[in-house]
């Protein structure tokens, strides 16, 4: 029997503050809680999977007979960003946070970047990605400058107008930054943020974003699966997050709708291993922008995909749905990620329905369970498999 796992990360779909959330400035946050009662939220299929039956979830209506197994996962890494969250999902806990720069990057680093790119740098302080275009976009165009800014996450972001700085050139500048940012300056991601428009009111980000990540500190689930001869298909920004390590095929997407379509298409293909999908719009378009209505609508769009996907699952298929952190769209103290538990929903023809796995202390639960199912030794990874609890 061909065994396939479809692991879908709803980027930032947290389900309530973790016990240490206050230390991250995120006490009381709850991404699911923020959207569940909005008129745009209609997720009967996630309900059937057991979303509202999960430990600690107090919104929504519990399903009387969930068709899948479900758990709440607590992050063990010291961070709440995309890179660390995905590494932990893949079985690698990060005991130390990646460096952040709340006061901007050191002048010496910025000067070196200016010299190597031949462009002046503007901003160099934490900023909202949309607001930074309004405040610096026109100046950047007049002065042929690059907009560089950190955030609460471990990132070095470079924005430029595509009409003045071609996308391939912006990517090259980001590669220069990635080479520079090591050791104490080793941010999790260097992100190219191309935009278009001519005035502060018309600037908008394009879909040509590109992330250059640190390589994971050791082998992840992806490497182990690839080394064992399994397919590891990366959909969306998964390839970038792992810097390509352990990936056998990458599929670039332009957002949730596109990512969902590619995932549905993969269902009809023959492969043995893992399809690892990231749906970024939850985080990028709605979480950070604190758009409750948009976030709720995106959840509803995904729910419709679940309804379409499940009937087409083969005998050896398992669908897993999770998240990498929170980004509560109703939380107004910041526009950053939020330190939250994440859901773990599991279903398939061979998966027991209605198994409540409680709260598990590591996102690496996912990596261990996937490797266990695919027959790959994961003794070097963090977390514990729940396969024996969920298989029929």
Predicted segment positions?
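Feature captures the catalytic ectodomains and active-site-proximal regions of enzymes
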Residues: 1-392
């Amino acid at each position: 029997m061909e065994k396939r796992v479809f692991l879908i990360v709803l980027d930032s779909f947290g389900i309530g503050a973790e016990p240490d959330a206050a230390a991250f400035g995120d006490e009381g946050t709850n991404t699911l809680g923020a959207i569940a009662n909005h008129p745009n939220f209609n997720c009967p299929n996630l309900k059937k999977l057991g979303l509202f039956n999960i430990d600690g979830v107090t919104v929504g209506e519990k399903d009387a007979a969930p068709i899948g197994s479900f758990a709440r996962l607590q992050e063990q890494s010291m961070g709440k960003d995309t890179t660390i969250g995905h590494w932990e999902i893949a079985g690698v806990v990060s005991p130390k946070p990646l460096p952040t720069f709340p006061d901007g990057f050191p002048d010496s680093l910025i000067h070196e970047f200016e010299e190597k790119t031949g462009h002046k740098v503007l901003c160099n302080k934490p900023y909202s990605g949309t607001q930074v275009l309004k405040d610096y976009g026109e100046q950047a165009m007049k002065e042929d400058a690059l907009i560089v800014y950190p955030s609460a996450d471990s990132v070095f972001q470079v924005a430029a107008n595509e009409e003045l700085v071609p996308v391939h050139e912006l990517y090259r500048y980001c590669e220069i930054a990635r080479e520079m940012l090591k050791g104490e300056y080793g941010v999790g991601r260097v992100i190219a943020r191309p935009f278009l428009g001519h005035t502060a009111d018309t600037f908008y980000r394009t879909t040509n974003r590109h992330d250059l990540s640190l390589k994971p500190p050791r082998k992840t689930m992806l490497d182990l699966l690839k080394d064992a001869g399994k397919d590891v298909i990366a959909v969306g920004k998964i390839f970038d997050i792992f810097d390509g390590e352990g990936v056998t095929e990458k599929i670039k997407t332009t957002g949730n709708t596109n990512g969902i379509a590619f995932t549905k298409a993969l269902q009809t293909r023959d492969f043995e291993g893992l399809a690892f999908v990231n749906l970024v719009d939850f985080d990028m378009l709605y979480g950070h922008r604190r758009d409750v209505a948009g976030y709720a609508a995106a959840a509803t769009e995904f729910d419709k995909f679940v309804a379409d996907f499940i009937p087409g699952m083969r005998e050896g298929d398992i669908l897993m749905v999770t998240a990498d952190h929170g980004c509560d769209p109703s939380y107004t103290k910041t526009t950053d990620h939020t330190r939250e538990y994440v859901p773990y929903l599991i279903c398939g023809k061979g998966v027991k329905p209605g198994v409540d796995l409680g709260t598990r202390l590591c996102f690496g639960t996912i990596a261990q369970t996937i490797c266990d199912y695919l027959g790959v030794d994961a003794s070097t990874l963090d977390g514990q498999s729940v396969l024996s609890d969920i298989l029929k």
